[in-house]
Amino acid sequence: MLQLTTYRNLQVFLVIMTAIGMSFALFFLQRYMGFSPCPLCIFQRIGLMIMGGFALIAALFHPKSMVIRLLLWLGSLAGIGWAAIVAGRHVWLQHLPADQVPSCGPGLDYWLDTLPMQQVLKEVFAGSGECASIDWTFLGLSIPEQSLILFSILILTHLLILWRIVRPATPKPLAR
């Protein structure tokens, strides 16, 4: 019987979720709906891609060494953890009273061209008016709220992967 929670299957699940999330953002939200991603959205996507990259490496090479598995897990967790933190900040900005919403800034491209990276991060996390606007909802949830739910599920998946790294699945003896 196929066991769905093996190390490799869980890594493949993360890769598939990355592909679905990125496809949804690019093809539906950007191309079909016409939304341009705000700086916080871009940073969430970067975190999701980092997670997906580490998960892809883990799924393709299926390392036997616990140390390598843990390093890949940490890289993947760092990516999705980053995305979840950014999504949490984004949700917080969207729930600020209108008079406390930061004004719109010059944009991420300008910041990247003119400011050092540390200052860019500070500006992005300070947020802007475009990050606080709610352009679309589904089931009463804004895009960052939906993203935060997805990222939370992926973090829980990482806990299951850690369990598989520490306590690998043992094959069951065949019944006679």
Swiss-Prot record:
Single GO MF annotation: protein-disulfide reductase activity
Residue ranges that the UniProt entry lists as topological domain Periplasmic: 29-46, 89-145
Primary location class: membrane
Cytoplasmic compartment spans: 1-11, 64-70, 165-176
Any Gene Ontology biological process: protein folding
Alphabetized SUPFAM superfamilies for the sequence: DsbB-like
Transmembrane segments annotated in the record for this chain: 12-28, 47-63, 71-88, 146-164
Localisation per UniProt entry: Cell inner membrane
Alphabetized UniProt keyword annotations: Cell inner membrane, Cell membrane, Chaperone, Disulfide bond, Electron transport, Membrane, Oxidoreductase, Redox-active center, Transmembrane, Transmembrane helix, Transport
CC annotations in GO: plasma membrane
Membrane protein topology class: Multi-pass membrane protein
Keyword Repeat: no
Cystines in this chain: 38-41, 104-131
HAMAP family per the UniProt record, alphabetical: DsbB
Cited PANTHER family: DISULFIDE BOND FORMATION PROTEIN B
Function: Required for disulfide bond formation in some periplasmic proteins. Acts by oxidizing the DsbA protein.
Family membership: Belongs to the DsbB family.
Protein name per its UniProtKB record: Disulfide bond formation protein B
The organism's taxonomic lineage, starting at the top: Bacteria, Pseudomonadati, Pseudomonadota, Gammaproteobacteria, Moraxellales
